[in-house]
From Swiss-Prot:
Its EC number is 2.5.1.122. Belongs to the tryptophan dimethylallyltransferase family. It comes from the Eukaryota. One of its GO terms (biological process) is alkaloid metabolic process. 4-O-dimethylallyl-L-tyrosine synthase; part of the gene cluster that mediates the biosynthesis of an unusual class of epipolythiodioxopiperazines (ETPs) lacking the reactive thiol group important for toxicity. Firstly, L-tyrosine is prenylated by tcpD, before undergoing condensation with L-glycine in a reaction catalyzed by the NRPS tcpP leading to the diketopiperazine (DKP) backbone. Afterwards the alpha-carbon of tyrosine is oxidized by the cytochrome P450 tcpC to form a hydroxyl group. Homodimer. It comes from Claviceps purpurea (strain 20.1) (Ergot fungus). Keywords: Transferase. This is 4-O-dimethylallyl-L-tyrosine synthase.
Amino acid sequence: MPFMFETILSRVKWTANTLVARLTTLYEYEYPRTAKEETGIDKEYHIKLWDEDIGAMLVSMMRLAGYSEQSQKTHRIFFKEQVARSLGLYPTTYPHQSAWESFMTDDHTPVEMSWSWSGNTPTPVVRYAAEPISWHAGTASDPLNSEATTECLASTAPLAPSLDLRWYRHFLKHLVADDSDGQHDTTDHLSQEFIAFDLDKDSMTVKYYFLPTLKSLACGKTNLELMEESILSLPEADEAVRSSLKVLTTYIRAYPQDEQPQAEIFAVDCVNPANSRLKIYVRSRKTTFDSMLEMMTLGGQTPDLTRDAIDSLRELWCACFALPNNPSVTSKPLRSKEHRTGGLLYYFELRPGAALPTSKVYLPVRHYGKTDDQIARGLSSYLYKRGQCLEGGLSYYEGVRRICKHRSLKQGLGFQTYITCAVKKGVVSVNAYFNPETCQYSRG
């Protein structure tokens, strides 16, 4: 009875806070879009399915990471009341076909989850990203899915005390296409906006992702050119940001045209610009360990990695891809994989006051690993050696086995999507990303 009362009270408080926050946020930031009232869809049915599937996985990940029961309830309520409500139609047939195919994951599931071990922290932070999808996205009434993101973003205010949308508003104008930009004939994806949440004890930090391909096509420019112009027009783009951007763009453009890494995604933290980051994501088709080090240091322009850091990165590389950890492995490319998301993904972070970018690499284990079982065992061993695990000393492998409830880890590849690594002060930080595979595997 006390638990039920507490849950009801939490929902009442959440609803009240959300109503106030939406009105305040929408007024303060003058959102240009309004949501249409749709009929003919049993929305509550689809919301319930999203919550029972991904909401339950989110709680499992939080519990395994050591979050309190109150924290789990707080973030589960937000997911159900705000995020699940923003994911559109839940897939009920397999293979799933939808009018809107999200670029978030390879099977188009519009949510990706992660555990993040920062530096020497023993247990991870839980994070997730979502692409809000309107009920009629991809149809004539909402061809570019322009209606869902605004409401979801506004609803974050009660749990995001540091929310600041100045940079969001700036880049929304520069990087997102709308119907007025004309025809959008492309064989690539139509996704343009993702929202991400880093979960603290009783709050969260919001991040926003822009995929500017449609806007670039409309403007007749490359993604990199569009990102560059939008950053340089930013009022807070100080000399350090400009210098950092110049280092990055010069390095990328120095590649031969057919080998040039391609800019794909741009992201900001929705916090005070003085504390925010500008993140440019680029994909390279080169897949050797040596090429990874080359990209991470921008050809040696950023501070050199220490020998210990390089050894740690090589150990992680071999663990993720089931390769022998010896010197010869560094020059051998991973097996050939012709896929839209093949190759290695990097992000380069620009900050006010920082004259050089910092980097992170995303290892696409879903393409180059053997099975999810092999990947989980490899990363589990790597983390264990560094004193990193889940709550109560539970191994990463056992944690992944528990959250992947719809199939055996040995029976497929793709539940773990990326293993990322970044080096800060000589210490390697690792994140593991998961695709719930909702659009690929039946839960029935």
